[in-house]
Amino acid sequence: MGQAPALSLEWTTQTRPPIEAVAVDPDPLPYPEEYRDRITIDVIHDGDVIPEEYLVDGRGRPISRDAIDRAYIHERDWGASFVAGRIARRLGLECFHNVTTARCLLDFGRFPGVTRPGAPHLRRSAINLPFADRLRFAQARRLLEEHYDVISKAMDEAIRGKLLKIAVHTYDRYNPSGTERPQVSVISRALGYQMDGELPYGVFDPLYPDILAEFTVDRMLPSRLSLQLERQGMPVAQNYPYLLPEGSPEVRHQVWSFFDWLEARFQTAHPDTETSPAYQFVWRMLKDTNMRLGDAGMLRAYIHRFRRPPSYYAQAFSNAEDAYRHIERYLRRNHDAVISEYRFSAERPMSFGIEVRKDLIHELDHLGRPVRLVPERAARIADGIADAVITYLTEDRVPHDFHDPVMARTSRWYGPGGEPNK
């Protein structure tokens, strides 16, 4: 491949759409035709755009260029777009989606908002230092509306109808504690489920079954990724050194997909509800996984926190609460069947993140900053990831009912149900 050109560590103020479909020259389709157009790949942390309007604080004073530079270099997933493009090409895809907005300005991998002081890394919000404490309200609001919401809409369109979403990231060699990170890590479990056996209360609607957060992708695919890459001499970890924060697109995608599926199932059983404004209001609230709809937030607070609605909305909220209780009763009556049907369905939408260490695919300077991409190594890792997906689609996607009954998925580990703290 030859030596790659030196990287620029500079960001740009030249605006582009916050998310772009990056075209690639695809290889011939390497898996069954039924999976054509069922895979999407995205990169959300390799952007380089910081619009000029956000370089000054709420009083019009310039934000420190040094602080922005440090955050930009540290936060960016250097090389992720190269890896994603190579995977997309190998999988016969025509494009992947890349967020152009710099992560240090806006992190689409978190819930919208401004990070509170002292928040741990996995509990951050979308707007972080050095911008979190410098932007005025109007700036932060515009940033979310013109970037976060635009990215979200494009992602929704890209993901809808897909079977598999792959999020490509790169990370530093060392944890903040100084321990070395794995060369490659596959992330497919929600943080809250790992820590407490359930998602944090109030993040998503309680109707979402916590057990679905145990894994965001068929277990065989991470295992296939590990086997494929380990055979090629690349050590792989799973769900380490961290897990998926609840605000990650992968977890939000899982919750949205379940409620979208449940809506169709419920409406099949109760077709008279399909055009009801009250039921439409409830489904909109349940699928507001980005926490961006004001009316959904009001209904959520009305149902779960007994907040008083504005008087002119009182009847609409009361009707919506009745609809919510109907959906709740339906889910409880059919709990085991619904969860089992969805959880192990061959058509359950899947998503996972994959992390590749930055030092494996870059030459670094004495400060640990990327100087030049090492394309041969980056391509080898990307091809290994793609080959694992191909093998999974062509060989591993078999029905689950071939197991010995003794091995049936009925324990707390496998469900259905089994939420320990409910």
Q: Predicted segment positions?
A:
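N-terminal catalytic or cofactor-binding beta/alpha core of small enzyme domains
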Residues: 2-422
